[in-house]
């Protein structure tokens, strides 16, 4: 093997190895973009009071853990919990992403939200501010919410 062909071989190997982090980063960026879209869809559905749409954003075995209310496990229970919420309260809130980490087929997002909530029966409105933790799972149908909990911001 000539010096030139050895150099070429080494250069090719180096180029291949150097490209691996970019391929991983590209996949990571794709996952992050998909998760941003999922969070935006959740926000839109929450503000629209659309429990059916929210149900579809969860995994089949998804868990919703609202502060001060029973845990809802599985899509039918999640749907029921959101239906109950929307019968009583309407939201106009915006989520801000504080942290997003992707690790393989799982990810989490830490967010905070602010806006208003309105009591359906009376029309009384007030400020709404919460902290949220979303755990996501990559499924055959894309990223879904696997676990979600929130509490009031202090």
Regions found by a protein language model. Name each.
Residues 120-122:
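Extracellular loop and loop/strand-boundary signature of outer-membrane beta-barrel proteins
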């Amino acid at each position: 093997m000539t010096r030139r062909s050895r150099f070429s071989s080494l250069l090719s190997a180096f180029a291949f190895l150097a490209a691996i982090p970019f391929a991983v980063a590209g996949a990571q960026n794709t996952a992050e973009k998909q998760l941003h879209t999922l969070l935006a869809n959740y926000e839109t559905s929450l503000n629209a009071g659309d429990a059916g749409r929210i149900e579809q954003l969860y995994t089949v075995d998804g868990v919703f853990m609202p502060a001060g209310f029973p845990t809802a496990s599985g899509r039918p229970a999640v749907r029921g919990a959101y239906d109950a919420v929307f019968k009583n309260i309407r939201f106009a809130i915006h989520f801000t992403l504080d942290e997003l980490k992707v690790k393989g087929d799982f990810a989490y997002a830490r967010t905070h939200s602010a806006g208003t909530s309105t009591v359906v029966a009376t029309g009384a409105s007030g400020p709404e501010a919460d902290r949220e933790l979303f755990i996501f799972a990559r499924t055959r149908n894309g990223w879904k919410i696997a676990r979600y909990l929130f509490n009031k911001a202090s």
